[in-house]
């Protein structure tokens, strides 16, 4: 299983990174791409902010269209939630000297990827480098 971090999912949704697009297209048919519930929340939070901060009807119209596009994009992936195995990893990362300082959203994404023994694809490799056992690759740079 391959989990896409929020930065990669966002890039993929824009289809503007040729290296990433080619890497995704070259995957075996049996490879499963997934997004965590955290990535879904982060992507939709950004769209909600644009809707709430729209200064006029044109901005609101564009913000609503982008929100709907993002929703359509998100449903094309399997969704991974925090399960019992993820909770165990979460507890462990909270106790780690280096990992307890991680952003909470990154920590939760790492926990979900670990629980599913998944490869995490991210541009933010440094954010996850201290998570023992987490497989990380950058397909965009």
Model-identified regions with their sequence ranges:
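Acidic, PIN/NYN-like endoribonuclease modules and their adjacent C-terminal/linker elements
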Residues: 1, 110, 114-141
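Short, well-structured N-terminal submotif of metal-dependent ribonuclease cores
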Residues: 1-38, 49-68
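Generic structural signal for small/hydrophobic residues in well-ordered secondary structure
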Residues: 5-6, 43, 90, 113, ...
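Alpha-helix capping/helix-boundary segments
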Residues: 8, 39, 86, 109, ...
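Short, flexible helix/strand-to-coil boundary loops that buttress conserved ligand/catalytic motifs
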Residues: 13, 24, 47, 94, ...
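Active-site neighborhoods of divalent-metal-dependent phosphate/nucleic-acid chemistry enzymes
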Residues: 47-51, 73-119
């Amino acid at each position: 299983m391959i989990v896409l971090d929020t930065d990669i999912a966002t890039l993929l949704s824009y289809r503007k990174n040729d290296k990433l697009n080619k890497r995704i297209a070259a995957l075996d048919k049996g490879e499963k791409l997934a997004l965590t519930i955290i990535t879904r929340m982060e992507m939709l939070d950004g769209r909600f902010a644009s809707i709430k901060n729209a200064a006029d009807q044109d901005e609101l119209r564009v913000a609503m269209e982008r929100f709907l596009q993002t929703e359509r994009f998100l449903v094309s992936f399997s969704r991974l939630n925090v399960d019992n195995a993820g909770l165990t990893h979460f507890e462990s990362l909270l106790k780690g000297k280096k990992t307890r300082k991680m952003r909470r959203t990154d920590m939760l994404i790492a926990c979900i990827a670990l629980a599913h023994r998944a490869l995490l694809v991210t541009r933010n490799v440094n954010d996850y480098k201290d998570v023992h056992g987490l497989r990380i690759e950058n397909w965009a740079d």
